[in-house]
């Protein structure tokens, strides 16, 4: 920023490009002369009545002998580093075509990044977060340079951020090398073309934006809490004349769009000299609108060269730049900047004091916090009710036990009314998975009975204390109004209902009972399903609940004689009805919130469950967000009597062969968790016997390996969450049969290096025969290095490929052609990644290394077709895997999970749809999942 006049103004610098070889060959004369570091003079003879001056004054003028480092230090450094102080800044490169704008901007960007990282290293007291984005405007179409596609992005108006680009990728910078890689990607993605004036002319406007957020590691009142600002490096395309560039077709169209956008930009600059304006006739002005606002600073770097033909262009742009230097609207700029920095700390305090709000789109993310808040509010309300309860007893003269018990009966009746549904609805409710857990998450309602007090949690909102008092009084009035006959009839009805509930609970206990420690209170959990809310009693407290119910039923009979003689008032009936309506309204609110939360969970990808009918499948499921092991209610009697069914039994899905023309239709072949093979009879009608035998052998082999792999775990667990202890017969069945399959002392399979190399070579040959995708080969080759634990995975891959080869050989040519086409498309995609990942000099060495002529066509595609071709040369295989890994950006092999190749014997919690064994897709996911 340069100070002058009434305040700070936009810094404008001019750099003169030296003559190139063509200009020297033509003996061109320099028409511009740098008098000093602020003035430039035109040496060309001007007409007497010329409207243009011969001398121009700018903030900085750099001659043709000035290096880019000096241009940055004197003209752009202060503006670029404003972003570290929380001030938005922008650096433009503006000039005619072939004037060296891109060359200058690349150097300025590099030096600015160096200074920013140096500043970050020195100021260790603050935590910095850097985000980088890059966009390109080509023919008035906005494109994201980091996305890798040519899709056009829309411009959206945000009330807080201004004009934003739709789905713009913002990369979080990890280090200096990461930023250099992103700059290289932007350089390769930008549109360039050849014209008569420039061989590598930029045909688009490029905007590189670096956003820096800094936060103090230790809070102090003297420093602001958080600073956030952005610096934009803008390389505008050069203006050009069609008569000089001799362009036509696409180049002419590009030049028209470039000139139109630059003309609009000049108009905006001239109008900004007097008043702010809302002119946005092109995409450039839309995106750069924030650079002309108050909270920003800007530096305009003009590039020019000494040519007589371009004097008019430079003079026209000089007028625009002179307009930029006027400080008429810039005075408010710095004042607002400093005001913004001073008020940032106060704004942070205001934001911290605000109560967290919950909206519908993030309801299931903050569910636990919402439940905790509502629990606290409800607990406070219950305490107030308990404090007021003795006063109400004294005023009415009625025992508290009778009152609390009657309210308990009413609430139970309300809950039973909520459970009543049609038979069809009950079937839907029964399809839900019930969870009975002492330490369950607060996704369920809990009715806790302790010392004859009733607590309901969590609810939508806590009822106020006055409403609670009204409930108690209305309950008492209703009790007074009831006649002895009515009381006796109600008690008989309650006894019948209690007897039915005891009988039902006894039946449920036979199914769901589990040993658990004695507890001092009984808990009833209600888990809401997508269709209805159902009340389920805790299996660990069945006996206590039954005895408590019987005692309270007897207590009703004794207390009825005490309560029947109490008089009633005329308005008791109305009061009771009003209370009942309030209770119903509260229940509706609770039901609405829980149903809304359930619906949000169903829409989210983290809420996927298998719905099985309780008689066959009655176990606990767990969502991805829940990391606790939930107790299941599966009785040994039910487990022993489990019958394998095609529709209801939990089975291990191994694979599914997709039907193709000329190929028999086959559905999934599965074996259950007990390792007993079960094959769908419907799929065996048209099944090939030879293919079926091989398939059975493959499944049997995997089944045997699954047993062995399951036996090496120290404490294996079934999917039910119950520790598994193999019987004597099972231990005999899983005993190793060969030295290769023996279990070492550390609990892993032992495998010699010769056996590993033999299996590896055989797998590589089968990969080539089956046309397995190169991505899968690379992952597998880099991940499994011969560790003892790799034996199972190598054996599974070998069996899978052997079965696949036999299947393809028995099948028609359709499947083989499909795999060949898929592999060809993959190689074409890999060839497109070579220019993006490697610069030109590295690609030359790569072509020579793989035996591709440098002057030939489609060199990258030739390299892609040479990958993984020589299956006998291990050096060739290693080089192929290394190249594919670099192109695809694979992580380190030590960080890649081996379970990604499908030998995850523990069942997955979500309902994963079987994608089938498609020959046109990757063969990297054969999972033993349920």
From Swiss-Prot:
<feature type="region of interest" description="Disordered">
    <location>
        <begin position="655"/>
        <end position="686"/>
    </location>
</feature>
<keyword id="KW-1017">Isopeptide bond</keyword>
<dbReference type="InterPro" id="IPR036961">
    <property type="entry name" value="Kinesin_motor_dom_sf"/>
</dbReference>
<keyword id="KW-0493">Microtubule</keyword>
<feature type="binding site">
    <location>
        <begin position="95"/>
        <end position="102"/>
    </location>
    <ligand>
        <name>ATP</name>
    </ligand>
</feature>
<dbReference type="InterPro" id="IPR001752">
    <property type="entry name" value="Kinesin_motor_dom"/>
</dbReference>
<feature type="compositionally biased region" description="Basic and acidic residues">
    <location>
        <begin position="473"/>
        <end position="482"/>
    </location>
</feature>
<dbReference type="GO" id="GO:0007018">
    <property type="term" value="P:microtubule-based movement"/>
</dbReference>
<feature type="domain" description="Kinesin motor">
    <location>
        <begin position="9"/>
        <end position="273"/>
    </location>
</feature>
<feature type="compositionally biased region" description="Basic and acidic residues">
    <location>
        <begin position="533"/>
        <end position="558"/>
    </location>
</feature>
<keyword id="KW-0547">Nucleotide-binding</keyword>
<dbReference type="GO" id="GO:0005874">
    <property type="term" value="C:microtubule"/>
</dbReference>
<dbReference type="InterPro" id="IPR019821">
    <property type="entry name" value="Kinesin_motor_CS"/>
</dbReference>
<dbReference type="GO" id="GO:0005524">
    <property type="term" value="F:ATP binding"/>
</dbReference>
<dbReference type="InterPro" id="IPR027640">
    <property type="entry name" value="Kinesin-like_fam"/>
</dbReference>
<comment type="similarity">
    <text>Belongs to the TRAFAC class myosin-kinesin ATPase superfamily. Kinesin family. KIN-7 subfamily.</text>
</comment>
<dbReference type="Pfam" id="PF11995">
    <property type="entry name" value="DUF3490"/>
</dbReference>
<dbReference type="InterPro" id="IPR021881">
    <property type="entry name" value="NACK_C"/>
</dbReference>
<feature type="compositionally biased region" description="Low complexity">
    <location>
        <begin position="459"/>
        <end position="468"/>
    </location>
</feature>
<feature type="compositionally biased region" description="Low complexity">
    <location>
        <begin position="666"/>
        <end position="681"/>
    </location>
</feature>
<dbReference type="GO" id="GO:0008017">
    <property type="term" value="F:microtubule binding"/>
</dbReference>
<feature type="cross-link" description="Glycyl lysine isopeptide (Lys-Gly) (interchain with G-Cter in ubiquitin)">
    <location>
        <position position="805"/>
    </location>
</feature>
<dbReference type="InterPro" id="IPR027417">
    <property type="entry name" value="P-loop_NTPase"/>
</dbReference>
<protein>
    <recommendedName>
        <fullName>Kinesin-like protein KIN-7J</fullName>
    </recommendedName>
</protein>
<dbReference type="Pfam" id="PF00225">
    <property type="entry name" value="Kinesin"/>
</dbReference>
<feature type="region of interest" description="Disordered">
    <location>
        <begin position="449"/>
        <end position="569"/>
    </location>
</feature>
<keyword id="KW-0832">Ubl conjugation</keyword>
<keyword id="KW-0067">ATP-binding</keyword>
<keyword id="KW-0505">Motor protein</keyword>
<dbReference type="GO" id="GO:0003777">
    <property type="term" value="F:microtubule motor activity"/>
</dbReference>
């Amino acid at each position: 920023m340069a100070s002058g006049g009434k305040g700070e103004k936009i810094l404008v610098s001019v750099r003169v490009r030296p003559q190139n070889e063509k200009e020297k060959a033509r003996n061109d004369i320099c028409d511009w002369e740098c008098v000093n570091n602020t003035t430039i003079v035109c040496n060309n003879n001007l007409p007497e009545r010329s409207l243009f001056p011969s001398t121009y004054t700018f903030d900085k003028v750099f001659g043709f002998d000035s290096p880019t480092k000096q241009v940055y230090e004197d003209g752009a450094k202060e503006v670029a580093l404003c972003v570290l102080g929380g001030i938005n800044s922008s650096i433009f490169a503006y000039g005619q075509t072939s004037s060296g704008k891109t060359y200058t901007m690349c150097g300025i960007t590099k030096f600015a990044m160096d200074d920013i990282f140096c500043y970050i290293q020195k100021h260790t007291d603050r935590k910095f977060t850097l985000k980088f984005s890059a966009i390109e405007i080509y023919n008035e179409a906005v494109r994201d340079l980091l996305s890798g596609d040519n899709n056009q992005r829309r411009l959206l108006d945000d009330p807080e951020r201004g004009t934003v680009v739709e789905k713009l990728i913002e990369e979080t910078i990890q280090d200096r090398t990461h930023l250099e890689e992103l700059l290289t990607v932007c350089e390769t993605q930008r549109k360039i073309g050849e014209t008569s004036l420039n061989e590598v002319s930029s045909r688009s406007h490029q905007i590189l934006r670096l956003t820096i957020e800094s936060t103090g590691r230790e809070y102090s009142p003297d420093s602001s809490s958080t600073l956030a600002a952005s610096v934009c490096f803008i390389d505008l395309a050069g203006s050009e004349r069609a008569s000089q560039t001799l362009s036509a077709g696409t180049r002419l169209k590009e030049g028209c769009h470039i000139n139109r956008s630059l003309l609009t930009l000049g108009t905006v600059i001239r109008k900004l000299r007097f008043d702010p304006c809302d002119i946005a006739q092109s995409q450039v002005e839309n995106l750069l609108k924030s650079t002309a606002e108050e909270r920003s600073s800007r530096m305009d770097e003009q590039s020019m060269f000494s040519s007589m033909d371009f004097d008019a262009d430079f003079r026209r742009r000089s007028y625009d730049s002179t307009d930029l230097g006027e400080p008429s609207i810039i005075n408010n700029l710095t004042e607002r900047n400093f005001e913004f920095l001073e008020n940032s700390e106060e704004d942070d305090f205001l934001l911290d004091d605000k109560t967290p709000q919950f909206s519908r789109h993030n309801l299931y993310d903050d569910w636990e916090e919402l439940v905790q808040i509502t629990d606290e509010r409800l607990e406070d309300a219950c305490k107030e009710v308990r404090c007021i309860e003795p006063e109400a007893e004294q005023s009415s003269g009625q025992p508290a036990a009778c009152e609390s018990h009657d309210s308990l009966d009413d609430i139970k009746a309300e809950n039973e009314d909520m459970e009543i549904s049609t038979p069809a609805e009950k079937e839907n409710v029964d399809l839900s998975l019930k969870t009975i857990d002492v330490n369950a998450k607060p996704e369920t309602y809990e009715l806790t009975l302790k010392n004859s007090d009733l607590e309901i949690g969590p609810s939508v909102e806590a009822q106020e204390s006055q409403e609670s008092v009204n409930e108690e009084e209305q309950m008492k009035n209703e009790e007074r109004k009831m006649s002895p006959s009515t009381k006796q009839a109600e008690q008989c009805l309650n006894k019948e209902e209690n007897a039915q509930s005891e009988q039902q609970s006894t039946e449920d206990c036979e199914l769901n009972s589990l040993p658990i420690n004695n507890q001092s209170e009984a808990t009833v959990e209600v888990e809401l399903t997508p269709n209805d809310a159902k009340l389920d009693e805790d299996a660990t407290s069945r006996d206590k609940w039954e005895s408590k119910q019987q005692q309270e039923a007897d207590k009703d009979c004794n207390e009825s004689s005490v309560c029947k003689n109490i008089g009633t008032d005329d308005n008791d009936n109305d009061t009771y009805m009003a209370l009942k309506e309030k209770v119903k309204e509260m229940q509706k609110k609770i039901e609405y919130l829980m149903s809304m939360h359930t619906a949000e969970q169903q829409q989210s990808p983290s809420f996927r469950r298998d719905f099985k009918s309780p008689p066959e499948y009655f176990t606990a499921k767990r969502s991805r967000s829940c990391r606790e092991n939930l107790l299941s209610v599966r009785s040994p009697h039910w487990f022993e009597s489990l019958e394998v069914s095609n529709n209801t039994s939990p089975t291990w899905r191994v694979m599914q062969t997709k039907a193709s023309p000329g190929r028999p239709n086959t559905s999934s072949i599965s074996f259950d968790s007990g390792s007993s093979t079960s094959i769908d009879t419907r799929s065996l009608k048209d099944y090939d016997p030879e293919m079926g035998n091989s398939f059975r052998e493959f499944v049997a082999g995997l089944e045997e390996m699954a047993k062995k792999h399951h036996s090496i775990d120290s404490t294996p667990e079934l999917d039910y969450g119950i520790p598994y202890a193999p019987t004597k017969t099972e231990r005999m069945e899983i005993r190793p049969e060969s030295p290769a399959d023996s279990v070492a002392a550390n609990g892993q399979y032992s495998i010699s290096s010769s056996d590993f190399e033999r299996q590896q070579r055989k797998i590589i040959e089968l990969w080539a025969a089956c046309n397995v995708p190169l991505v899968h080969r690379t992952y597998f080759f880099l991940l499994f290095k011969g560790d003892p634990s790799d034996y199972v995975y190598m054996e599974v891959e070998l069996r899978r490929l052997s079965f696949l080869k036999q299947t393809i050989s028995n099948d028609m040519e359709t499947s083989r052609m499909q795999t060949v086409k898929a592999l060809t498309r993959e190689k074409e995609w890999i060839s497109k990644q070579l220019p993006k990942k490697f610069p030109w000099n590295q690609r030359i060495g790569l072509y020579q290394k793989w035996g591709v002529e440098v002057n030939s066509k489609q060199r990258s595609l030739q390299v892609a077709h040479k990958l993984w071709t020589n299956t006998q040369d291990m050096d060739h295989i290693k080089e192929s895997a290394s190249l594919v890994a670099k192109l695809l950006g694979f992580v380190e092999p030590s960080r890649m999970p081996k379970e990604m190749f499908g030998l995850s014997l523990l069942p997955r919690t979500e309902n994963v749809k079987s994608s089938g064994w498609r020959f046109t897709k990757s063969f990297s996911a054969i999972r033993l999942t349920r």
